[in-house]
Amino acid sequence: MTESTYNGYRRIDFTFQGREAVLVFPKEENKTTKWMIKTEYFNAFPELEIAMLGRGYHLAYLKNNNRWGTEDDATAKRDFSEYLQAEYGLDRRCVCIGMSCGGWEAVAFASLYPSYISLLYLDAPLLSFFGLCEPYRTDWIEEHKKARGYATAGERFVDNDLPIHRLGTLTDNRLPVALVYGGADKVVDPILNAEALLDWYKLHNAPIKVWYKPECDHHPHVAVNLEEVMDYIAENEI
């Protein structure tokens, strides 16, 4: 275990089940037992995580074997959650923060283990392979095949066990969502991902709030009123 700082907060790095793990602690004066997990891209666009540390949340991260929502990664997050409960007294449920492919990971985790989730923050989430604006990029095809065991590129589009197919578990369990996305996203199609999620949640009268950035491309993530986002999280997490 090594100790350092993360934007002024105490950070520990350690190994959990052979994976890189991180836990960042809030200041003692406003520390709570609440916590959030960043599902992918730990150091990218950290504005929300830093702001929530300021509200007393812990920040956790566990390295994935891949970015594509395989069951081994979701199960490792469940085990990691139980470890953080036992070792540090954190709550059973966490805020799950997923940006881009991290949104895929977040929905995969939440759909398999909904009782470990208090709320999902999804920022330009990718929920299916057909939701990519360039699904036939060679590097992506090879990454997808390796992660999920596909023999061909076309297999990706007939797989019916992707995050987009698991939204029913989220709404059945009334898991709240804070959704942020840009209308000019050229990486993750907003209609086939964020808006499909929004339509599903509306159809099932499930709790969701949207921050829409009409001129925003895939990046930057966040770039919205963080106080509004954090207030929504505080008022709606279960």
Task: Identify the meaning behind each predicted range.
Residues 24, 191-238:
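C-terminal catalytic histidine-bearing segment of alpha/beta-hydrolase fold enzymes
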Residues 31-41:
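Short beta-strand element of the alpha/beta-hydrolase
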Residues 134-138, 142-202:
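The feature captures the conserved acid-bearing segment of alpha/beta-hydrolase catalytic domains
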Residues 108-154:
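Hydrolase active-site cap/lid region
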Residues 98-108:
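Glycine-rich nucleophile elbow surrounding the catalytic serine of serine-hydrolase chemistry
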Residues 88-100:
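Alpha/beta-hydrolase fold nucleophile elbow
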Residues 1-31:
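N-terminal cap/lid segment of alpha/beta-hydrolase-fold proteins
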